[in-house]
Amino acid sequence: MSLKNGEQNDLSPKDSVKGNDQYRSPSGIHVEHEEESRNDFWQFESSNLFRHPRIHLEPQEKSDNNLKKFVIKKLEKSCQCSSTKAKNTIFGFLPVLQWLPKYDLKKNILGDMMSGLIVGILLVPQSIAYSLLAGQEPIYGLYTSFFASLIYFILGTSRHISVGIFGILCLMIGEVVDRELYIAGYDTVHAASNESSLVNQMSNQTCDRSCYAITVGSTVTFVAGVYQVAMGFFQVGFVSVYLSDALLGGFVTGASFTILTSQVKYLLGLSLPRSGGVGSLITTWIHIFRNIHKTNICDLITSLLCLLVLLPTKELNERFKSKLKAPIPVELFVVVAATLASHFGKLSEKYGTSIAGHIPTGFMPPKAPDWNLIPRVAVDAIAIAIIGFAITVSLSEMFAKKHGYTVKANQEMYAIGFCNIIPSFFHSFTTSAALAKTLVKESTGCQTQVSGVMTALVLLLVLLVIAPLFFSLQKSVLGVITIVNLRGALCKFKDLPQMWRISRMDTVIWFVTMLSSALISTEIGLLTGVCFSMFCVILRTQKPKASLLGLVEDSEVFESMSAYKNLQAKSGIKIFRFVAPLYYVNKEYFKSVLYKKTLNPVLVKAAQRKAAKKKIKRETVTLSGIQDEVSVQLSYDPLEFHTIVIDCSAIQFLDTAGIHTLKEVRRDYEAIGIQVLLAQCNPSVRDSLARGEYCKKDEENLLFYSVYEAMTFAEDSQNQKERYVPNGPSFSSD
């Protein structure tokens, strides 16, 4: 058998006879030896011969975690009423009351007016174009952008983001609208006359296709807004953390392919049903190629001319944005030129091109959402609400950090929620912040939320005076504007090589989300991306990195021996680091990698038992022979080490399975005479170990505050054990 001091001893027959009882009860040896070893361990620990004193920290008194008391305390605090609290509540809910009285007119007004004017000019054609994407009439896009700009001015905390119409949300709204129109029995190919549709609504007559479409859109918007306000109220904004940058990037790119596909029919002048549901992108392209011979040549030529103007000018704006005081509003110029050409050339009458039609001036009477539709659209609104607030909060925090101020994420959720709830009563659909317009707003001198008021005034001018002038505007022009604005999302492919070098896992998440969003559907794509992203997190912790550590020369620092050279491995001590939480998913991997890098105590124990049986049998035969005195040598090869130190600095938490695994590992190693020490456990892990009874009251010294302390303790205790070891053999197992 292996001796604790690594030596071999010869036993005479006389000595062997004394030990026969122990051999007949191997388990008795183990219990007796383990108890003796443990007593020696604590005796050594309490002696004064250690080179370094142990670190002892006094824990803070823990707060009372009684749920009932916590809830009562919160309710008492919430129900207290005073003039100061009422004032703070009002000012917190309406941030405009805080910052507007302090507004520096001379310093900020010029930049706010300039940025608001330019964003308003850009929003006019985009609002009209994105209305088609949402399955609505052009006027509703203008309503949406107008109300969102005003409400965010009152409730928002970000000085720079532009809240209004957003392509991805318009696509998601449009899919719901088309589905409900189909269920209601409306023709999904040919809409009723634009003029008659809107006249009926203005005069409160029977609701036709256009009326029902905006009813569905407003209802979805209302429900999404309620979700967002509820998220703010219950402070569940943490949901957005599951939408990583890679996931959002893949989702936006995948949805952009769907948007592009939905606009191709306008570029070609085709009257096609809008495909929805699973595989809509493929279905739409099949319909396009089947009807390609019906292409309207006038619409095709108009689309190509607009592309030739818009794409180069957009690139110039991007390349020379640092030199331009304001971006060239090329979209507005294209819309004006195309409208004039269509009107005076009578393109609709001569060539049958599809035009925007009558856009009324003024505002329609408020109308409540259709409460009967809410159960049918409630699930659709969840994804819309999450995407809307995730993009808004992330953009507001990004620009706040860039310009050195803070935003309140909860208030941002309230703001975007009410930007959807209130306008839903005024024939509007879902809004959120948009990166492209926010960048324009920032680059043109925006200083505060006053910029949003200027944007709203531009849109109000269009709504009251200019809107009817867009009657002859071709829908192909609006389709081109929508597609050109997707170039940022579609150009993300050029960033993939760099993303692959930085994180292959993020790149895979991006591709999975992009492909599922494009080829299946936007909602399923988002859900697939979230599920796959969470699976990747679990996968990363299922088989994390684990390594043996060595000591950096002339220091108390330990690092991975597989990552760095010239590290010193301490004789007789193995230091093991596991870089992940230890829980039910990776508990088996933890044991397997620890056993692989040190030794498997179960196999060693089995080998010792087998060897013990063979030597007992041999001894019995020898003693019963004719010889009076025979020397029998019982020995094992000594183990390479006596202590394992587990560096727990990277273990964020333990669950029940993790605690049980540590107990099992410790028990298995102690059975062969190897002590297990834990080092650098954070307070959470220490609490878990205490609750799981990993250490008994007299075993708290198994936990160390640093790896160096644990290593020193192991060396000193082993040195003292060798002094106390008796002359006779000391077996490490039964």
Swiss-Prot record:
STAS domain mapped to chain residues: 563-714
Function comment: Sulfate transporter which mediates sulfate uptake into chondrocytes in order to maintain adequate sulfation of proteoglycans which is needed for cartilage development. Mediates electroneutral anion exchange of sulfate ions for oxalate ions, sulfate and oxalate ions for chloride and/or hydroxyl ions and chloride ions for bromide, iodide and nitrate ions.
Subcellular location field: Cell membrane; Apical cell membrane
Posttranslational modification: N-glycosylated.
Region (Disordered): 1-38
Upper taxonomic lineage: Eukaryota, Metazoa, Chordata, Craniata, Vertebrata
Glycosylated position list: 194, 204
Annotated TM spans: 113-133, 138-158, 222-242, 247-267, 269-289, 292-312, 379-399, 415-435, 453-473, 519-539
Family statement: Belongs to the SLC26A/SulP transporter (TC 2.A.53) family.
One GO location term (cellular component): apical plasma membrane
UniProtKB keywords: Cell membrane, Glycoprotein, Membrane, Phosphoprotein, Transmembrane, Transmembrane helix, Transport
SUPFAM superfamilies listed in its UniProt record: SpoIIaa-like
UniProt-recorded name of the protein: Sulfate transporter
GO biological process: chondrocyte differentiation; chondrocyte proliferation; sulfate transmembrane transport
Membrane topology note: Multi-pass membrane protein
Reaction equation(s) it catalyzes: oxalate(in) + sulfate(out) = oxalate(out) + sulfate(in); sulfate(out) + 2 chloride(in) = sulfate(in) + 2 chloride(out); oxalate(out) + 2 chloride(in) = oxalate(in) + 2 chloride(out); bromide(in) + chloride(out) = bromide(out) + chloride(in)
InterPro entries assigned to the protein according to its UniProt record, in alphabetical order: S04_transporter_CS, SLC26A/SulP_dom, SLC26A/SulP_fam, STAS_dom, STAS_dom_sf
Organism: Ovis aries
Signal peptide span: none
Residues bearing the modification Phosphoserine: 12, 16
Compositionally biased region (Polar residues): 1-11
GO MF terms, alphabetically ordered: secondary active sulfate transmembrane transporter activity; solute:inorganic anion antiporter activity; sulfate transmembrane transporter activity
